[in-house]
Regions:
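Extracellular ectodomain segments of secreted/surface proteins
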Residues: 259-300
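Short, hydrophobic/aromatic beta-strand segments
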Residues: 122-132, 263-266, 302-306
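An acidic-aromatic substrate-binding cleft motif
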Residues: 280-289, 350-367
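Beta-strand-rich N-terminal accessory domains
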Residues: 1-115, 119-213, 229-233, 240-241, ...
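Aromatic sugar-binding surface patches on proteins
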Residues: 320-331
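Solvent-exposed, conformationally flexible loop/turn segments
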Residues: 245-248, 283-289, 324-326
Length: 367
């Protein structure tokens, strides 16, 4: 239901609330995210930039590049909040005449799901080059004020088990998790700047070039290509999606709570993602044994681990059943060459996750 109307921003605000989530949504974007019953009443989303904003870059049949901001369109339609058997749902749709973007949220028990559908409404084919999801957490450090209530985000970009975690600077209170669902992956990210349109150019330059926010991409062919030309080394191969007239492509994500950031990995594993713990870490001396633990709900036969381009999987040396209905698989390996290495994890039906390591010279040499 509509709880209020923001006169300054000229937007309707909708509430999705239950025993776990206290969420406000407007124009398809989360502008307030709190956990119900949180004694700290921590705000996780930036009230202006929010979570879940969609930016799409596509090419038409004439190779013209168009950038589409789904949440900033004047012509958008919100269905409002609909009550379902086990929860609440919300949907909005916007279009530029060539593509139509539908953004829906469904709150059910302890999970808030977000689904994005991109439809080619034109009569000719188009190519989706970049699809980005804006994630701006509530972070505003002011001189003389405590930094504790501010929220910081940490991201792992590596296939189907990519994720973002958000928690207070002081580590207190619950941890918010953002993760892909179904067949959706995250393959790229960047940090961008936002400027207050009410500020003049001089004021913008004097405010440290605007407020930063993170964009997460299921794929980003154009942006990755631009980054590579500027010297970036791309770990994940990017791609584009061709949509003929009337065709649709979908992306699914979930917001989850963990009681503490130390419990976030367990919560992700329960949701079907691969949670990895590596000892001694991801930067290790050449030839040093790495102990890797993978936790998930997948069976041992459904999880295969490969090192770099090897076609032979690394053998699992031990398994453990956990009380949370998850399983832990343990592996040992080492890197004999210096530099970057990739551990590829294939699981389920064509799902994949990536871990990135860097092998340094032995400690004796570095010392």
């Amino acid at each position: 239901m509509i709880r209020e109307y923001d006169m300054k921003e000229k937007r309707k605000i909708y509430y999705l609330t239950n025993a776990e989530f206290d969420v406000q949504i407007s124009k398809g974007m989360i502008i307030s995210m709190k956990r119900t019953g949180d004694s700290y009443q921590t705000q996780y989303a930036d009230e202006k930039l929010g979570f879940g904003g969609i930016c799409i870059l596509y090419e038409d049949v004439h190779k013209n590049t168009v950038e589409f901001f789904a949440n900033d369109q004047e012509t958008y339609q919100e269905s409002g909040v609909v009550r379902r058997d086990n929860g609440l749902s919300y949907q909005t749709e916007s279009s530029d005449g060539t593509i139509s973007v539908s953004i829906s949220y469904e709150l059910e028990y302890d999970k808030l799901s977000q689904k994005i559908q991109v439809i080619n409404t034109s009569e000719k084919e188009i190519t989706l080059c970049d699809v980005g999801i804006r994630q701006a957490c509530h972070t505003e450090f002011k001189w003389g004020e405590s930094a504790s209530p501010n929220v910081i985000g940490h991201y792992h970009i590596g296939g189907n088990s990519s994720h973002g975690t958000y928690y207070r600077v002081d580590g207190e209170g619950p941890c918010l998790i953002f993760a892909p669902q179904e067949d959706t992956q995250l393959l790229y990210y960047d940090v961008q700047k936002w400027f207050n349109p009410e500020s003049n150019e001089r004021e913008q330059k004097e405010t440290e070039e605007g407020k930063g926010f993170t964009m997460l991409y299921p794929f980003a062919a154009k942006r990755a290509e631009r980054a590579a030309k500027n010297g970036a080394r791309l770990r994940a191969q990017q791609h584009t999606v061709l949509l003929k007239s009337g065709e649709t492509v979908s992306f699914s994500f979930a917001y989850l709570w963990a009681d503490h950031f130390l419990r976030a990995g367990k919560r992700m594993a329960q949701e079907g993602l691969i949670h990895a713990v590596s000892i001694p870490g991801y930067t290790i001396p050449q030839g040093t044994n790495v102990q890797l633990c993978l936790e998930s709900t997948w069976g041992q036969g459904e999880v295969k681990v490969f090192c770099d381009e090897s076609k032979k999987p690394i053998s699992c040396i031990r398994t453990k059943e956990c009380e949370s209905d998850t399983k832990q698989y343990f592996y040992e390996f080492s890197f004999e060459t210096l530099g970057e290495h990739t551990i590829s994890i294939r699981y389920g039906k064509q799902k994949q996750a990536y871990l990135y390591y860097f092998a340094t010279q032995p400690v004796e040499t570095l010392w």
